[in-house]
Amino acid sequence: MFGKGGLGNLMKQAQQMQEKMQKMQEEIAQLEVTGESGAGLVKVTINGAHNCRRVEIDPSLLEDDKEMLEDLVAAAFNDAARRIEETQKEKMASVSSGMQLPPGFKMPF
């Protein structure tokens, strides 16, 4: 099944990948992305741990309907969460791109 040194090489690759993934997770935790709604009138910035770092609301919205503003804030947060998820997937996929994985093996991300 594994050629000469194949299992050893696979274990070495797994160790390297684990180290890369840990480093990548630390980098991701430091990332910040901004989601928007209402054509940029509401902006929410979150970090890689999905913690809200900043909320920006255009002053013109403060005079409008409270319910609409709440909806815009929620939509901006959801947009930011979607963006951070996409960024995380892209970065984690780059970790495993150089590995020679067995056919059919899928990474858990």
Swiss-Prot record:
InterPro entries hit by this protein: YbaB-like_sf, YbaB/EbfC
UniProt keyword Cytoplasm, yes or no: yes
A GO molecular-function descriptor: DNA binding
Record carries keyword DNA-binding: yes
Principal subcellular localisation of the protein: cytoplasm
Compartment(s) of residence: Cytoplasm, Nucleoid
Gene Ontology CC: one annotated term: bacterial nucleoid
Subunit field text: Homodimer.
Alphabetized NCBIfam families for the sequence: DNA_YbaB_EbfC
Official protein name in the record: Nucleoid-associated protein YbaB
Natural source organism: Escherichia coli (strain K12)
Gene name, Swiss-Prot/TrEMBL: ybaB
